């Protein structure tokens, strides 16, 4: 059983408010053909569990096939552009992440407008960050890690899943609030970054739990702290570890092409809310270290505005530029 908290109550209020309107106004024929979920990352990544879960549940609810279409590359721009060019009829969904608000802050010539070419439907997941190190790192706490990093300026290499990705920005926020100067080693995807961390070629990563929890449990990696991650019992939060200013998370959410009718958006949001607030869904995702974070269109839009400022401030101070 999951206790009723403010997030659950807010989600229930949201659903109660939009369900009658959505059912009354959404076109009766929608959906009238297969639905495609575009995922801007390779198969097996942290977005796959929720993509396939909601795909299965939408098929059960609506009787239409749902195709998960992984289109990795271009720092998520390939899948995002494909979504922007799709008919605005609710049959193409973009399962996106924090990168959606980060890319415009780093890339001057995006082939789409992240704000004007899309409409928000719902947030689904929030993924907290954990500071994870190779066992050879002589630090068992965040404060010991900070002291070590300060004693060897640029001497601790940290991995990221790509230049300008959310975990790169998370590491730079850590540098800013801890006063450290770690050296960035970007990879083309989280899988290779974790493999090199396992081999000791890099010493640290700021990762969502999905990709590292099995290695932490096996003792191949060590977690020093997290921002509130499910699935890491016994590991302190950054606040408990004496670094409350390190507060950042990534998210996964559904967007649709601009021009999609509001009744279609409401019908989608209503069904997604039912799926994400189902205790069975929450249990399945918690097992992967992911926490349900359902918000409807308006709350999602407000959150993106706040994140644009927060990520923008970190990027500006760190002077992060696309290479």
Briefly describe each language-model feature range.
Residues 19-21:
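N-terminal signal peptide c-region/cleavage motif recognized by signal peptidases
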Residues 1-13:
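N-terminal secretory signal peptides and thylakoid transit peptides that target proteins
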Residues 32-34, 177-180, 217, 240, ...:
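An extracytoplasmic/periplasmic, membrane-proximal ligand-sensing/linker region
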């Amino acid at each position: 059983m999951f206790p009723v908290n403010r997030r659950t109550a807010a989600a229930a209020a949201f659903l109660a408010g939009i369900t009658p309107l959505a059912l009354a106004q959404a076109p009766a024929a929608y959906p009238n053909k297969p639905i495609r979920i575009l995922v801007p990352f390779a198969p097996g990544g942290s977005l796959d569990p929720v993509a396939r879960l909601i795909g299965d549940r939408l098929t059960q609810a609506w009787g239409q096939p749902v195709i998960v279409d992984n289109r990795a590359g271009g720092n998520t721009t390939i899948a995002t552009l494909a979504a922007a060019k799709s008919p605005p009829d609710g049959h193409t969904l973009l399962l996106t992440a924090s990168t959606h608000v980060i890319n415009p802050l780093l890339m001057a010539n995006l082939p789409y407008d992240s704000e004007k070419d899309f409409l928000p439907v719902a947030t689904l997941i929030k993924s907290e960050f954990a500071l994870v190190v190779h066992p050879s790192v002589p630090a068992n706490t965040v404060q010991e890690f900070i002291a070590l990093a300060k004693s060897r300026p640029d001497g601790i290499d940290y991995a990221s899943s790509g230049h300008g990705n959310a975990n790169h920005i998370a590491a730079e926020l850590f540098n800013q609030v801890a006063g450290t100067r770690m050296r960035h080693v970007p990879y083309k995807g989280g899988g290779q970054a974790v493999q090199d961390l396992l081999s000791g070629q890099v010493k640290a990563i700021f990762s969502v739990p999905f990709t590292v929890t099995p290695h932490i449990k096996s003792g191949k990696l060590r977690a020093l702290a997290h921002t509130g991650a499910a699935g890491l019992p016994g590991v302190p939060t950054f606040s408990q570890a004496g670094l409350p200013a390190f507060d950042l998370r990534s998210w996964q959410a559904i967007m649709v092409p601009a021009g999609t009718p509001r009744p279609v958006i409401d019908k989608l949001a209503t069904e997604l809310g039912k799926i994400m607030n189902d205790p069975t869904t929450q249990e399945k995702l918690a097992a992967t270290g992911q926490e349900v974070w359902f918000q409807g269109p308006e709350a999602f839009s407000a959150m993106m505005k706040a994140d644009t400022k927060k990520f923008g401030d970190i990027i500006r101070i760190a002077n992060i530029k696309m290479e």
